Curated annotation (Swiss-Prot):
Organism: Schizosaccharomyces pombe (strain 972 / ATCC 24843) (Fission yeast)
Biased composition (Polar residues): 18-32
UniProt family annotation: Belongs to the SLC35F solute transporter family.
Residue positions, PTM Phosphoserine: 463, 466-467
Annotated localization: Golgi apparatus membrane
TM region(s), chain numbering: 141-161, 173-193, 208-228, 235-255, 265-285, 290-310, 326-346, 362-382, 389-409, 415-435
Protein name: Uncharacterized solute carrier family 35 member C320.08
Record bears the keyword Membrane: yes
Membrane topology per record: Multi-pass membrane protein
Keywords: Golgi apparatus, Membrane, Phosphoprotein, Transmembrane, Transmembrane helix, Transport
């Protein structure tokens, strides 16, 4: 129970009339040690709803942030007993030492379901207003912006390592497996350490199905995108890859009930427009974009981009509710299982005939380390901003690839490239021009008592439970998954799509 909770011993029904005076004394003595209630009792009587006293339950209410609490009861003569501990706004001379403040919660402290939250507090405004260009003075925006470019550089680095390895080997599923395996070795033991074996396996049995779905879309997104480049040309692949951004916007709108400002949609369109200019520049400058089977390759790219969209949306949802080590650990655990199965199905012949060299080992090690960094940092960006901003930030990776290509592969810069890069960067700024940078951090789908306080999150006053209770430390992560909520969101998304295509009779 958080600090400020009030426990009132309740007498049995038979002894209510005989002990009403002792009950009054106990309430006033335990909850009003400074004698404040008497001066406020009469004035506060009309401010509260009248309710009957329940004899078979204790009365408890807490408001840890504002410091107010209320008790209602009924004495033997039918009059109501009311007690109020005044809030900080009363500016009374109260001994603060008698009400110690709990330390801030840590990454593992998870909010309880809304039904278990003891007291209601003021909601955080779900759509903060922002003056035009005010975001330029917001430190949080610049952190999100530069973090997005770091992740974009990670994508560029992985593409570079893939480019080197493509001439030596063709083992995309095995490469992905090694990335998931490293993530599992790092994050899963730490998750077990924080939760304990019993609660960890309880989470696996009760909530593993969610992470299997999450990991499946992530693995298949990686697989189909790599596969698409073997059949279609770079022009089609680059354009269709931007479908991941559109998919995230649609899925966030339907599944997470996110509502976008018109300036955010304009920013997304500007970023995609910049990507189109990049592709056109490639066509003009390099020209030869023959494809083995463009129809099949385009289909693979659409499937892969859609899987990326689903994966990013789910990761933003999970990262807002759970510690990062749980989200990454579960994704990598099930991802490694799925990817090793695909490796034996699709890559086993290549592995048997592969000639390992130190050069290939270096490229593979670089690919794995960069992907490890990408998977570790991406959930932080999901918390601080959104999956949509993450995807439009990655669109600059084509420009960074050109910069590397100039120095490594001897590429020549076409004049449309700088314009395209500026247009993408402009789109990132337009995305936040009329919207507070903290708006997406609030996560409107989080209810009271939900959410996690950790790296990149915005503190939500009613969202956390005390970290001092050892029982909560072990149970919070299991409780915070909210099985029914996920199923309800999936069903609501189904109804939303159905209502679009099916007319009501």
């Amino acid at each position: 129970m958080v600090d400020g909770s009030i426990h009132v011993p309740v007498q049995s029904h038979e002894g209510q009339h005989d002990n009403s005076s002792s009950l009054n004394e106990e309430i006033q003595t335990s909850q009003d040690p400074l004698g404040i209630v008497e001066s406020y009792q009469e004035s506060s009587t009309s401010d509260f709803d009248k309710s009957h006293y329940t004899h078979n339950s204790s009365i408890a209410a807490a408001d840890s942030e504002y410091g107010s609490a209320f008790i209602q009861g009924q004495s033997s003569n039918g009059s109501e007993i009311k007690s109020e501990r005044p809030s900080i706004d009363k500016k009374l001379d109260v001994n603060i030492d008698s009400h110690p403040i709990e330390p801030p919660p840590f990454e593992h402290d998870i909010g309880l379901p809304a039904s278990q939250v003891p007291a209601a507090e003021e909601e955080v405004e779900s759509t903060p207003k922002a003056k035009p260009l005010y975001f330029l003075l917001d430190k949080r925006f610049w952190i999100v912006f530069f973090l997005g470019q770091v992740l974009s550089l990670c994508i560029t680095a992985t593409n570079t390592f893939n480019g080197y390895m493509s001439g030596i080997s063709n083992i995309p599923a095995f490469q992905t497996f090694l990335v998931y395996a490293l993530l599992t070795l790092v994050y899963t033991p730490y998750t077990v350490f924080r939760m304990g074996f019993k609660k960890y396996f309880e989470m696996i049995f009760r909530h593993g199905w969610k992470y299997i779905i999450f990991a499946f879309f992530d693995v298949e997104g990686n697989y189909f995108v790599v596969l698409a480049y073997q059949y279609t040309n770079m022009l089609s692949a680059s354009l269709l890859d931007s479908w991941a951004t559109v998919a995230v916007v649609i899925l966030s709108f339907i599944f997470l009930k996110v509502r976008y400002h018109w300036s955010q949609i304009l920013g997304v369109v500007a970023c995609i427009g910049g990507l189109v200019l990049l592709v056109v520049s490639d066509v003009i400058s390099r020209g030869d974009y023959s494809a083995v089977n463009p129809g099949l390759g385009d289909g693979y790219m659409i499937i892969g981009a859609t899987c990326y969209g689903v994966s990013n949306t789910l990761e933003e949802y999970f990262a807002s509710k759970l510690p990062l080590y749980v989200v990454i650990g579960q994704l990598s655990l099930y991802g490694s299982i799925i990817s090793i199965i695909q490796t034996f199905i699709f890559d086993r012949h290549h592995l048997y005939t592969l000639h390992w060299t130190s050069e290939m080992g270096g490229y593979l090690a670089g690919f794995i380390l960069v992907m490890f960094l990408l998977y570790s940092l991406a959930p932080i960006l999901f918390r601080m901003s959104s999956a949509t901003f993450y995807n439009i930030s990655l669109l600059t990776s084509d420009f960074w690839s050109l910069v590397i290509g100039i120095h490594v592969f001897g590429y020549h810069v076409y004049w449309l490239y700088p314009i395209a890069f500026v247009l993408i960067i402009l789109g990132l700024f337009v995305y936040h021009v009329f919207v507070d940078a903290t708006r997406e951090s609030i996560k409107p789908w989080l209810k009271k008592g939900q959410g996690v306080d950790g790296v990149g999150t915005v503190r939500r006053p009613p969202s956390l439970v005390s970290s001092n209770d050892e029982l909560n430390k072990k149970n919070d992560i299991v409780v915070a998954h909210h099985d029914n909520e996920v199923k309800e969101r999936i069903y609501d998304a189904y109804l939303s799509v159905k209502n679009v295509f099916v007319r009501k009779s």
